Amino acid sequence: MEQTGGVGGCLLRADRIERGRRHDLGGQHPHQGAPFRRGRKRGDFANAIGRSRGGRTTKIHALTDAAGRPLALTLTPGQAHDLVGLGDVLARVPTPKVLIADRAYDARKLRDRLTERGCQVVIPPNPTRKHPAPWDRDLYRARNLIERMFCRLKDFRRIATRYDKRADTYLSAVLLAATVIWWLN
């Protein structure tokens, strides 16, 4: 992994993308009951489409280098916790020297696993923790690089509003946009 910029590590963040209109109910009348079937619905989870108050959403999990260029991307449904997509993203790159992430990634197992591998973990502790872990505030300021990467990613209309039904089609568009961002950055 190429180390450039002031921080020699990776940044991590998940971002939600809405799919369709807010009142889109997938062809069902709003007062109609759920269809009779056993087990969980197929299709939506496999296509990384989740439901939340804002409608159907998808999370893009991204890992960037110190220059804000995307290294690894993956999709999960919008209601899934951020740690769900973390394993897939971290498996695609070698262990970074520094990992900067937001509070949603504050988990003891994650900290221990990355510290064992020699990675410095910079994650602000969850305010409900009894024993908060130490973190470097100055190094955490570099997290805005991933926010700017997501801003550049959402400049592409197809990424900002998900028009694709299938997750692999949408992910290919995200990866194509990430390639353009890498090339221009």
Regions found by a protein language model. Give the residues of each.
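Short alpha-helical elements
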Residues: 1-185
